Amino acid sequence: MTVKCANDLDTHTKPPFVARMIHRFAVPIILVWLAIAVTVSVFIPSLEDVGQERSVSLSPKDAPSYIAMQKMGQVFNEGNSDSVIMIVLEGDKPLGDDAHRFYDGLIRKLRADKHVQSVQDFWGDPLTAPGAQSNDGKAAYVQLSLAGNQGELLAQESIDAVRKIVVQTPAPPGITAWVTGASALIADMHHSGDKSMIRITATSVIVILVTLLLVYRSFITVILLLFTVGIESAVARGVVALLGHTGLIGLSTFAVNLLTSLAIAAGTDYGIFITGRYQEARQANENKEAAFYTMYRGTFHVILGSGLTISGATFCLSFARMPYFQTLGVPCAVGMLIAVAVALTLGPAVLTVGSRFGLFEPKRLIKVRGWRRIGTVVVRWPLPILITTCAIAMVGLLALPGYRTNYKDRAYLPASIPANQGFAAADRHFPQARMKPEILMIESDHDMRNPADFLILDKLARGIFRVPGISRVQAITRPDGTAMDHTSIPFQISMQNAGQVQTMKYQKDRMNDLLRQAENMAETIASMRRMHQLMALLTENTHHILNDTVEMQKTTSKLRDEIANFDDFWRPIRSYFYWERHCFNIPICWSFRSIFDALDGVDQIDERLNSIVGDIKNMDLLMPQMLEQFPPMIESMESMRTIMLTMHSTMSGIFDQMNELSDNANTMGKAFDTAKNDDSFYLPPEVFKNTDFKRAMKSFLSSDGHAARFIILHRGDPASVAGIASINAIRTAAEEALKGTPLEDTKIYLAGTAAVFKDIDEGANWDLVIAGISSLCLIFIIMLIITRAFVAAAVIVGTVALSLGASFGLSVLLWQHILGIELHYLVLAMSVIVLLAVGSDYNLLLVSRFKQEIQAGLKTGIIRSMGGTGKVVTNAGLVFAFTMASMVVSDLRVIGQVGTTIGLGLLFDTLIVRSFMMPSIAALLGRWFWWPQQGRTRPLLTVAAPVGLPPDRSLVYSD
C-alpha cells in the first residue's frame, strides 16, 4: 500500500473556467491591461497631481477643537476655516521704524487679498504690541486666518498666495519674513510627500530588481515580473486617480504614498506566488499547461484572499473619523482590488505567453531539504518551538510598555522646507509655544463689557495661568500676557491720593502761615499789655485832670462873675468906645474896646469849661470801664494764640501722617504694578470709554461683547504628551473659575495645537479600535471562508495579532531606543491596519498548502507544505518587507516609520510566525486545527499506484 496525496487525486481534474479563458486569451488580456494602463497614464492626471487637486481636509469635523475653531471664526468674523499661519519678522538687530513700515505695508496687502480671511494685527497696535514681539526685540509675528481647511487645495493656494505677497514685498536690509505655522507645515508636508514619491518608487524598483535577480537568476524573468508589477501599479494608481479626479473620493499624501508602495509590494508578492508555484509544478515534471493550471489552482484563492484581506482591512479605515486614516480607506481598497484583478489575469497571461518561449522555466532546482528539516523539527518538537517563538515575540512585546509617541510634526519633516525654516527662526527669539497657541473662548448671553464681568474674565485668565505647564495667558485684562499696568486696586487707591499729594504743599504752607500769625498775635498781645498799662496811667491822669478842670471851672466862674461886676460898672464908659466912629483910628480907644471885647470871651470860656468838665467826667467814668476790658481781651488773644499753635502742631502731625500714608500707598501701588500682581484687578467704568481700550477689546471680545477669548501659551511644546494632557486641566480651570459667578452657564470652547492633537489622539485610539476590530473580523471571515476551518482561521488571526504587537514593539525598539526618535502618532494606526491585512497572506498560503497536503497526514502535510512553500513565501515576504521599508527614503519621516514598521512586521511574520509559530500550533492542535472539519492525522491508505503513474512530486525535490 502507498500513500496517495491530494495532488495526485487532482491530476486529471478539469481546469477552472477562468484559468482556461486566461490561458486561451492570454495575449488579448495583456493588450487590454496594457491599453488600460496607457489610457489612465496619458489621459488622466498623475495620482500626485490628483492628490493635490482633491486633497481633503485633515481636520476631523466632529472634533471639539474643530467645532471650537469654527465657532470662534463665526463669532469674531474671522473666517470659517481652521487654516491658520504665522508670518514671522526676524531682524539682525532690534526691529525699528523701517521694520514697522515694512510690516504695515505687508498687512495692507494681506488684508486686500481674497485668500486672507482675517489678520490678528497685534504688533501694529501699541497696546498689544509687546505681546507679539520677542524679548530681545529682534522678532515679531502676525497671525492670519486663510481660506480653506488644512490639507485642502484651497488652503494650499491660500498659503502660496501669502508667500507670493511676502516675496514680492521688499524687506528692509537685515530683515527676513518667514511664513510658518501649522497650516504651512501641512502644505509643505504634501509637497515633500509628493516629491518623495519618485524616490520611493525608484528605490522600491531597485530593491525588487536586486531581490528577484538573486532569487530567479534570470534577467528576463525579473523584467517580465516587473512589467506585470508596473502594469498593476499604473492601473491601480490610474483608476484611483480617475476616481479622485471625478470627485468621487478624496486623497491625501499618506494615501498616495501608501497605495503606491502597497501596489508595488503586493503585485510583486503575487508575481512571486504565481511564478514560484509554476516553477514548482514544472520541476514536478508537469507540462507547461498542466503546471499553469496547477499554479492557478494553488494561488488563485490565496491571491484573492490576500487581496480581499488587504483591501477589506484598509477599507475598514473608512469607518474611522480621523481624515488621516479615513482617506486611506477607499483609495487603498480600490487600488488593491485593481491590483488583485490585474494579478489574477495579467500575471497568468504573461506567464502563459512567456512560458511558450521558456522564459519562466526554473534555472535551478528549488531547494526544499532545508525547509523540510525545519518542518520536521517543528512537528517533532512543536511545544519547544512555540515557546521559543513566543520568547522571540516577547522581545518586541516587552518594548511596547515603553512606547512614547510624538506629536511634533515639524520633527518629521526636512529642516529645509520653508515652514520649518520659519519655525527655526521663531525658536531663535520666542518660546516654542508662541507659534502654536491654544485659544479658549467663552460665550455668554449678555454684553460682558462692564467692570463686574471683567473681574470674572480676569479671574478666568488667572485660573488658566495657574495651570501647571502654562507660561502665558493673553486676554482683554492682560493684552500682553501679564497683568495690565495700573489695574490693581492698591495702585488705583494710590492714584486717589494723587490730588491730596499735590495739594499737600499748599496746605503745609497755609499751616506755616498760622505759625506766623501766632507770632504776630504774640506781638499784638504784648502791645495790648503795654496799652493796658498806659491806659491805667491815662485813667489816673484823666481823674486828676477832672479834678483840676473842676477847680479851673470854679475859678473861671468866679472870674466871670468878677468881670461881670466890672463890666456892669464900666458899661457907660464902654459904650463910648462903641459909639466912637473913629475908634479904630484912635489907638487908646481901640485898645480899650479890644479889652472889653476880650472880657466878653471869659463868659464863653466858662461855658466851654462847663462842657469840658462834663466830658471829662464821662471820660473819668468810661476810662476805668475801658481799662477793665483789656485783661479779658489779652487773655482771649493769648487763648487764640495757644489754640492756633496747637492747631499748627496738630495739623503738622496730621500732614506728616498723611504724607507717610500717601508714600506707603504710592509705594504699595508701585510695588503691585512692578510685580505684575494680578490678585486685585479692577477696571473703573471710565476705562471702557477709552479709545485705545476700545481698540484692544476688538481683539479679545466679539463685536457685541457676548464672547471673549483667551490666547494661552504652554511652557513647553504643546505638541507633546504633557501639552496634550494640560487641555483637560485648562478646561477644568476655566469651569472652576466661572463656578458661582454670573458667567457660570457660559459655553466654553477650546482650540489650538494641543487641543487638536488631543482630539486626534483620542480619535486615533478609537479609530484604531474600530478599524482594528472590524479588520480582524473581516480577516477572520475571509480566512474562515477560504480554509473552511474555524480554528485554523482563529489561529491565523491570533498569530497575526501577536505578530502585530511584537512587530510594533520591534519598531519601538529600533526607532525609539536605538535611533532615539519617537514614533509619530500616525504610525501606530497606519502600520497596524496594514500589518493586519498583509500579515495574514503568508499564513493563509501556508494553511492553504496544509489543506492541499492533508491527505498525506497532518505532520507529513506540514513538512511537505513547508518544503513546498518555504522558499517562495520567504522570498515574497522579503520582497514585500524590503519594498515597504524602501519608504524610509521619503522626506516625510512618518512615511519612513510606517514603512519600516510594516517591513519589520513582515520580516517577523515571514521568518518567525509563518516558519515556526503557525506550523507548531497546527502540530500541537492536530486534527482540532481543522475543526469543524475532520482533519486527517494519518496518511490516506489506498491501493498501490499502477505502473507508469507519475511519482509524487513532493518527493522528487532535491538540494
Swiss-Prot record:
Pfam families: MMPL (PF03176). The chain crosses the membrane at residues 25-45, 205-225, 239-259, 300-320, 333-353, 381-401, 766-786, 790-810, 818-838, 872-892, 902-922. Keywords: Cell membrane, Membrane, Transmembrane, Transmembrane helix, Transport. It is a multi-pass membrane protein. GO terms for cellular component: plasma membrane. The keyword Membrane applies. InterPro entries: MMPL_dom, MmpL_fam, Mycobact_MmpL. The keyword Phosphoprotein does not apply. It is found in: Cell membrane. Gene3D superfamilies: Multidrug efflux transporter AcrB transmembrane domain (1.20.1640.10). Belongs to the resistance-nodulation-cell division (RND) (TC 2.A.6) family. MmpL subfamily. This is Probable transport protein MmpL4. It comes from Mycobacterium leprae (strain TN). The gene is mmpL4.
